[in-house]
Amino acid sequence: MRHGQTPSTGKVLPGRAQGLHLSDAGHQQAERAATRIAELARVDAVYASPLERTRETAVPIAAARTLKVQIDRGLLECDFGDWTGRELKELTRLPEWGTIQHAPSTFTFPGGESFIAMQTRIVTALDRIRARHPGGVVVCVSHADPIKAAVAHALGTHLDLFQRIVVSTCSITAVAYGTGAPVVLTVNSTGSSLAELRPS
C-alpha cells in the first residue's frame, strides 16, 4: 500500500527527502486503512520503506496485530536525484516530463535512479520478503511509483505503460503470489471491504 497524505502531496516531488511526516489527514487515512486491513483473517508481517511517511502509515497496521514494523530499503521511493524537492508545477513544464509519462523505461533522473532500476529494486524486494514468509500475508508500505512498477511487472505490462496505473495515498493494492504467475487482486482500493480478498 501507499503511504498516507503529507503536507506536500501533489505539490512537490519529495523523493527520499528526510523529515516529511504524515499530515493530520494522512494519519486519519492510515487509521482507516489499518481498520480495513484488520478485516483480513491474517497478517504475518508488516514492512515499510525507511522514510517517515511510510513508517507512520505502517504503525497502526502493525499495532492491530501486535507486530513490529520491519524496514526494507527495497521499498524506498525512486531516487529522484537533482529533482528531489522541486515543485511539480515546475517539473511538468520540462521537456523531460513527456518522456517520464510516455517512455519512462528510457529515463534516468539527473543524479538519481532510472525507472528500470527502480522496478528491478522493488520486484527484488518483494521476492525477498515473500521468501521470508512463504504462504503468508504481508503488508508492505511503499510509494506510488514503486507500487505502480510492481503492478506492471505482476501484470506482465511494459514499464512504459505504468503511468496508466493510479495509486492514491493510503490505497491498497493486493497481489497473490503462488507457483504460477502473480494474480493482481485489487489496485488502488480505498474503501471496499478486504475480507473476501483472495484469488478466484
Describe the predicted segments one by one.
Residues 2-61, 108-123:
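Loop-to-helix element that buttresses phosphate recognition and phosphoryl-transfer chemistry
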Residues 6, 146-147:
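Short active-site segment of divalent metal-dependent hydrolases/proteases
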Residues 31-98:
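Phosphate-coordination/substrate-recognition cap region in phosphate-metabolizing enzymes
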Residues 42, 78-89, 131-136, 153-200:
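Acidic, low-complexity terminal tails and accessory targeting/binding regions
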Residues 60, 149-153:
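Active-site signature of alpha/beta-hydrolase-fold catalytic machinery across serine-
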Residues 99-111, 195-200:
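Extended, charge-rich low-complexity interaction segments
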Residues 143:
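Short basic (Lys/Arg) and small-residue
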